[in-house]
């Protein structure tokens, strides 16, 4: 170690994730009539609707919406205020939408401009004449998550290069040129991904890792033709979770009824285990889709959106890890890392090989934001091992080491239902660690830093396993025993000792300590 001063620069495991999603939409300029706003939400409270969507998925603060009723007012607002997104509802009364978009971008180069139509007749007319002027065009279908979808699609497009480069955030490509269909798909895809990501937060060891997981959710990128889809695949091949595509869409400037199948063939030739879902209104396409090792979904199905959600959940690593045999027979389920490790130790070797050959383990880890662990597993092939038992041993030991590393130097939020005795430093209850607890936590983190480990050869310095009862639990103890008033009065040591000795612990805290 060159200098003890270097320790001042040490960072937490999640510090490198802090720069994820650097671009966030904070202010939206919305151009609409009052009636159009009423159509979006019956009571007209668009901001409340957006706030509720952000709260549902535990997202950071929702953007502010500034509404104007004309293109002229919008251009004036762009000159005087900062906005990250412009949304135009239907057509404008005082200016051609394409002309408005050009002027808006002249004032604010690079600002995303999105058109939201209400009727198919508006949509066709607008797309025919002005589509190139807009970043995206959507049609309002009554989906309350539409506004959230537009925001996240724009943010993903801006952030994807940096976020994949920095930590390997994963990407899902949607290929669809029908505004009606992608206006239905995208809200469902974002809702499903955010819902599953939120569900994973209960597995996080503390609030820092919870924040990381929300920032590290997969990005969704939209392509409307073959060339754009192929370009996205080639750029983000290393980070792809999967592809969801129509079969019929433009290729070489002309509508091609086999474009999706050709795209799947090209991708599967290079990444054979990548999940691909192809969709068509023509059931006869199913056999051709099967021939290129992709899944098929009929667009005319009454359960289209439900089946799409099931595909995302099953193939992109969300939900429980379900150990199956090659014939689909379910053997066991793992809800968390400990259960995955336990199952890996005993599950049928045929199931272990089946999942390893398809990168199911690394996909499941990636969905949980565990990119480093996934990178340890993904390069290894089944053929690298002498037999399935050597594969089992490697997987078990890698998971065991990871669980230990994951706890090292970290303050873990105690949860009775998932406590397994591996945590080195626990916090029990809500609130602050307190001064002494915070000092111990800092020293524990410091001693797990590599610079300290190598500073004194032959010497191991560590903090004993620790549990800190936080201020929230202490406040509950004081309140339950009516000790707050007592503490504020003047009493001698014997009286204070007697009062606290005779007090009882809150039942929740007592159960935590017994665990």
Residue ranges of model-derived segments:
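As written
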Residues: 97, 127-137, 288-296
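Hydrophobic/aromatic residues positioned on beta-strands within the core alpha/beta folds
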Residues: 116-118, 279, 299
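N-terminal beta-alpha lobe that positions the nucleotide/phosphoryl donor
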Residues: 334, 339-342, 347-348, 352-515
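Short, charged/polar "capping" segments at the starts of alpha-helices
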Residues: 37-40, 121-125, 182-183, 284-287
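Conserved phosphotransfer microenvironments
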Residues: 6-10, 39-51, 60-62, 67-75, ...
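Proline-centered loop/turn at the N-terminus of a beta-strand
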Residues: 110-114, 136, 171, 274-277, ...
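Non-catalytic signal-transmission and effector/linker regions of two-component phosphorelay proteins
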Residues: 1-66, 102, 130-136, 140-219, ...
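Cofactor-binding loop segments of dinucleotide-utilizing enzymes, especially the Rossmann-like FAD-
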Residues: 33, 70, 118, 177, ...
């Amino acid at each position: 170690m060159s200098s003890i001063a270097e320790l001042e620069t040490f960072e937490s495991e999640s510090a490198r994730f802090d720069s994820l999603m650097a671009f966030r939409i904070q202010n939206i300029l919305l151009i609409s009539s009052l009636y159009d706003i009423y159509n979006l939400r019956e009571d007209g409270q668009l901001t409340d609707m957006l706030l509720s969507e952000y709260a549902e998925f535990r997202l950071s603060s929702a953007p502010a919406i500034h509404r104007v009723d004309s293109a002229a007012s919008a251009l004036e607002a762009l000159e005087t205020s900062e906005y990250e997104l412009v949304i135009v509802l239907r057509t404008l009364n005082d200016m051609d939408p394409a002309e408005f978009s050009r002027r808006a971008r002249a004032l604010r180069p690079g600002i995303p401009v999105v058109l939201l139509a209400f009727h198919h007749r508006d949509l066709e007319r607008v797309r025919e004449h002005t589509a190139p002027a807009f970043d995206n065009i959507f049609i309002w279908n009554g989906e309350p998550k539409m506004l959230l979808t537009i925001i996240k699609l724009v943010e993903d497009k801006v952030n994807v290069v940096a976020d994949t480069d920095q930590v390997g955030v994963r990407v899902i490509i949607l290929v669809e040129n029908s505004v009606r269909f992608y206006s239905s798909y995208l809200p469902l895809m974002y809702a499903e991904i955010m819902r599953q990501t939120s569900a994973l937060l209960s597995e996080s060891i503390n609030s820092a890792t919870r924040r990381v997981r929300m920032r590290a959710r997969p990005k969704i990128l939209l392509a409307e033709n073959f060339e754009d889809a192929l370009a996205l695949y080639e750029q983000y091949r290393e980070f792809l979770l999967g592809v969801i595509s129509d079969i019929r869409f433009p290729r070489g400037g002309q509508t091609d009824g086999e474009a999706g199948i050709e795209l799947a063939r090209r991708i599967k030739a290079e990444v054979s285990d990548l999940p691909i879902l192809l969709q068509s209104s023509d059931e006869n396409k199913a056999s051709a889709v099967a021939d290129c090792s992709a899944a098929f979904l009929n667009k005319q199905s009454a359960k289209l959106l439900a089946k799409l959600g099931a595909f995302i959940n099953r193939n992109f690593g969300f939900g429980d890890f379900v150990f199956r045999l090659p014939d689909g027979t379910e053997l066991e389920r793992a809800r968390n890392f400990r259960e995955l490790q336990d199952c890996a130790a005993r599950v049928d070797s045929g199931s272990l090989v089946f999942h390893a050959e398809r990168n199911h383990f690394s996909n499941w880890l990636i969905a949980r934001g565990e990119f480093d662990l996934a990178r340890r597993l993904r390069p290894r092939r089944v053929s690298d091992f002498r037999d399935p038992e050597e594969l089992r041993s490697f997987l078990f030991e890698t998971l065991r080491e990871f669980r230990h590393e994951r706890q090292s130097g970290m303050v873990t939020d105690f949860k009775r239902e998932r406590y397994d005795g591996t945590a080195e430093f626990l916090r029990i209850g809500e609130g602050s660690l307190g001064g002494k607890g915070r000092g111990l936590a800092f020293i524990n983190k410091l001693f797990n830093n590599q610079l300290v480990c190598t500073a004194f050869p032959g010497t191991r310095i560590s903090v004993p396993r620790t549990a800190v009862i936080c201020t929230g639990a202490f406040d509950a103890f004081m309140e339950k025993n009516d000790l707050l008033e007592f503490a504020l009065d003047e009493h001698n040591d014997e009286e204070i000792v007697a009062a606290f000795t005779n007090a009882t612990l809150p039942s929740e805290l007592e159960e935590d300590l017994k665990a």
